[in-house]
Curated annotation (Swiss-Prot):
GO terms for molecular function: beta-tubulin binding; guanyl-nucleotide exchange factor activity; small GTPase binding. The modification Phosphotyrosine is found at residue 362. This is Ran-binding protein 10. The SPRY domain mediates the interaction with MET. Gene3D superfamilies: 2.60.120.920. The lineage of its organism: Eukaryota, Metazoa, Chordata, Craniata, Vertebrata. It comes from the Eukaryota. It comes from Mus musculus. May act as an adapter protein to couple membrane receptors to intracellular signaling pathways. Core component of the CTLH E3 ubiquitin-protein ligase complex that selectively accepts ubiquitin from UBE2H and mediates ubiquitination and subsequent proteasomal degradation of the transcription factor HBP1. Enhances dihydrotestosterone-induced transactivation activity of AR, as well as dexamethasone-induced transactivation activity of NR3C1, but does not affect estrogen-induced transactivation. Acts as a guanine nucleotide exchange factor (GEF) for RAN GTPase. Keywords: Acetylation, Cytoplasm, Nucleus, Phosphoprotein. It is found in: Cytoplasm; Nucleus.
Length: 620
């Protein structure tokens, strides 16, 4: 038998070892991609950057009598096999992450060799590899020659049938209750071990010549239906969560949840929804309606790419805010530069009829400096470009033919008109009502409030808080540049070709001049506050767009995606709230963040139930 199964890796103890299936640093092979998809489906809670999953046997963590081949998945014995002192084992490349919850691998017996002294199981780091799994402390194994299980002892216990050539033995580790069971040819054999410690490695051991086994860590579908077993335990864990007792203080619990929902709606500017929710639940709103609408107006401008107008509106509604937040001002100005390249900021859209803002702000205007206040302006009407949404997909209602530069908005914009109704708070809490005018210095003037019909940023208009620009359609989180504004005179093989500013020389000069002023602002902030590497990187990324004739397709073109407006919008919104002594983050988001962090800590502590209590499972 030994001669018939000649040692595939005879000679050097490490002969036949390969690199573990890596593709030489290039693109992953189709097999590796399929493995990654299968592991992601089986173990979605595992962060493989922090805790990689076992994918192969380790060429560095084995006894010399073990040889590896076929991507370090095949194990063969190359020792003498005279007695138990010739036993040899190998561990997997990584321990089993606790975040798996349930972990499973299978081993196929390619050849039982001379005597079939094979062991399949688990072991901790540092356990002697000159032994079969299960013989030493923190080592566990199921042996093929007698069907016994070995739990950290040289004395085995009757467990299951023997196994031989052609059999497939599976090993399932339940990190929720600390147990392990085996399968043979797809059928469970029952619990083998209990009270298992954390951080165990899949392990196999061989002892006689000719023994060969192949491992399956997910490279191929398993014989055993592990996903059905996972569903069973997921239901148990989620049942525990749902059954958590709160009946004794149900009213208090509901009040907390209602306040969290209300504050979330207010934070993101869903004014009408927050008002309706407050009426239904009798929940007080901790901010005046006029102030919510002011923030809503500013967010809308940023999400539309009209950052220059957003800056001016912020300075008008909340004077001193940007002057006391130079980092925020610089972020906004860099974003404005990007939007000018994108053709969405009014500085390049309105060159033919310059607004007072354009004349006051550039060039040589102090408005770039955080030391100076706002300049007067009007807000452009967005009626022609206002987005709508169908089934969660944003689209534009602009009936005009698309050119690279949309016609400038009328100066008689309805968004600059004042509301005839005086602002009022909605179910405003008594404890905060006396301080409302102090905390919101300009929110109570009638010429700053805009009607609900114009300003309400409901979900149907802003899917997930992202507004679609004229040039980009957002479909399920992906961007399709199928409605790009192009200079009709610029054609490449019969197709429109995008150009910087649509080839408009005046707009290009406007961008260059603005860039010089932005550079001057960066230098000024450096002198006053010291060098800021984040500012330098932000500026370089923005300026790099000018190095390409088609910035949308360049290596830094991701900056032009509308989704990049979201972090800027969130930072500005949080700063406004913080300036009014309101939370800069909604409590609901803080609670979700805390829950996610608790699950990460559970995984690090080896508590496997964290895998089946993911926050995403409760977000609908």
């Amino acid at each position: 038998m030994a001669a018939a199964t000649a040692d595939p890796g005879a000679g050097n103890p490490q002969a036949g070892d390969s690199s573990g299936g890596d593709s030489g640093g290039g693109l992953p092979s189709p097999g590796e991609q399929e493995l990654s998809r299968r592991l992601q489906r089986l173990y979605p809670a595992v962060n493989q950057h922090e805790t990689p999953l076992p994918r192969s046997w380790s060429p560095k963590d084995k006894y010399n009598y073990i040889g590896l081949s076929q991507g370090n998945l095949r194990v063969h014995y190359k020792g003498h096999g005279k007695n138990h002192k010739d036993a040899a084992s190998v561990r997997a490349t990584h321990p089993i992450p606790a975040a798996c919850g349930i972990y499973y691998f299978e081993v196929k017996i390619v050849s039982k060799g001379r005597d079939g002294y094979m062991g399949i199981g688990l072991s901790a780091q540092g356990v002697n590899m000159n032994r079969l799994p299960g013989w030493d402390k923190h080592s566990y194994g199921y042996h093929g020659d007698d069907g016994h299980s070995f739990c950290s002892s040289g004395t085995g216990q009757p467990y299951g049938p023997t196994f031989t050539t052609g059999d497939v033995i599976g090993c399932c580790v339940n990190l929720i209750n600390g147990t392990c069971f085996y399968t043979k040819n797809g059928h469970s054999l029952g619990i083998a071990f209990t009270d298992l410690p954390a951080n165990l490695y899949p392990t196999v051991g061989l002892q006689t010549p000719g023994e060969i086994v192949d491992a399956n860590f997910g490279q191929q579908p398993f014989l055993f239906d592990i996903e059905d077993y996972m569903r069973e335990w997921r239901a148990k864990v989620q049942g525990t969560v749902h059954g958590f007792p709160i009946s004794a203080r149900l009213g208090e619990w509901q009040a907390v949840l209602q306040n969290m929902v209300s504050s979330y709606l207010v934070h993101h500017g869903y004014c009408s929804t927050a008002t309706a929710f407050a009426r239904m639940t009798e929940t007080p709103i901790q901010e005046e309606q006029a102030s919510i609408k002011n923030r809503q107006k500013i967010q809308k401008l940023v999400l539309e790419g009209r950052v220059g107008e957003a800056i001016e509106t912020t300075q008008r509604f909340y004077p001193g805010l940007l002057e006391h937040n130079p980092n925020l001002l610089f972020m906004l100005k860099c974003r404005q530069f990007v939007e000018m390249v994108n053709g969405t900021d009014s500085e390049v859209r309105s060159l033919s009829s310059r607004s007072p803002k354009s004349q006051d702000s550039y060039p040589g205007s102090p408005s770039l400096s955080p030391r100076h206040g706002p300049s007067s302006s009007h807000i452009h009407n967005t009626g022609a470009d206002s987005p709508s949404c169908s089934n969660g997909v944003a689209s534009t209602k602009n009936k005009q033919n698309h050119s690279k530069y949309p016609a400038p908005s009328s100066s008689s914009s309805s968004s600059s008109s004042s509301s005839s109704s005086s602002p009022s708070s909605v179910n405003y809490s008594e404890s905060n009502s006396t301080d409302s005018t102090k905390s919101q210095p300009h929110s109570s003037t009638s010429n700053q409030e805009t009607s609900d019909s114009e300003m309400e940023m409901e979900a149907e208009h802003y899917p997930n808080g992202v507004l679609e620009s004229v040039s980009t359609r957002i479909v399920n989180g992906a961007y399709k540049h199928d409605d790009l504004q192009t200079d009709e005179s610029s054609m490449d093989d019969g197709h429109p070709r995008r150009q910087l500013c649509g080839g408009n020389q005046a707009a290009t000069e406007r961008i260059i001049l603005f860039g010089r002023e932005l550079q001057a602002l960066s230098e000024q902030l450096g002198r006053e506050y010291g060098k800021n590497l984040a500012h330098t990187e932000m500026l370089q990324d923005a300026f790099s767009l000018l190095a390409y004739s088609d910035p949308w397709s360049c290596p830094v073109g991701h900056q032009l995606d509308p989704i990049q407006r979201e972090p800027v919008c969130a930072a500005l919104n949080s700063a406004i709230l913080e300036s009014q002594n309101l939370p800069k983050q909604p409590p609901l988001m803080l609670a979700l963040g805390q829950a996610s962090e608790c699950l990460r800590l559970m995984a690090r502590a080896g508590l496997g139930s964290c895998s089946f209590a993911r926050v995403d499972d409760y977000l609908h």
